[in-house]
C-alpha cells in the first residue's frame, strides 16, 4: 500500500478540501480517469482500483498513478473515553478535488482502456469520467 516513507510530523489537522485540482490534464499516457467529484481516496482504494485495471488489461500497456496518499488519518480505539490526546494513525488518504486525473494508461486500445477504467471507478468513492489526451 502507498504511504510516505517519512514525514516531518506524525499527525495532521483535519483541514478542508476546497478548490479545484492541479494536475487536471493527461500528461503521461493517452487515456485517463478524471475525478468529477470531491472527496478522499484511501491507500487501499487506490490499490484496489490499480489491481482492477491491471487485471482488465491483462498486464499489457502502462499505468500511471497520479495521486499519492500523504495525509494521515487518526482514529481512537473502540470504547475509549474522549480526551487523552489524538488517536493513532490508522490509514493514509489523498485529498481529491474535481478535475484531478487519478490514473493514466497507454499502450492499449481505447475500448479496453474504457473498460478497465470502468472497473477501477467502481472501486472508488467519488464520481469519475474517462478522458483522452488533447493534442495541441
From Swiss-Prot:
SUBUNIT field: Part of the 50S ribosomal subunit.
Listed GO biological process terms: translation
UniProt GO MF annotations: rRNA binding; structural constituent of ribosome; tRNA binding
Record family assignment: Belongs to the universal ribosomal protein uL16 family.
InterPro entries to which the protein is assigned, alphabetical: Ribosomal_uL16 (IPR047873), Ribosomal_uL16_bact-type (IPR000114), Ribosomal_uL16_CS (IPR020798), Ribosomal_uL16_dom (IPR016180), Ribosomal_uL16_sf (IPR036920)
Cysteines joined through disulfide linkages: none
PANTHER family found in the cross-reference section: 50S/60S RIBOSOMAL PROTEIN L16, LARGE RIBOSOMAL SUBUNIT PROTEIN UL16M
Domain of life of the native organism: Bacteria
Keyword field contains Lipid metabolism: no
Role description: Binds 23S rRNA and is also seen to make contacts with the A and possibly P site tRNAs.
SUPFAM superfamilies (alphabetical): Ribosomal protein L16p/L10e
CDD domains linked to this entry: Ribosomal_L16_L10e
Residues annotated as transmembrane: none
Annotated protein name in UniProt: Large ribosomal subunit protein uL16
PROSITE patterns the record matches: RIBOSOMAL_L16_1, RIBOSOMAL_L16_2
Record keywords: Ribonucleoprotein, Ribosomal protein, RNA-binding, rRNA-binding, tRNA-binding
Cellular component per GO, a single term: cytosolic large ribosomal subunit
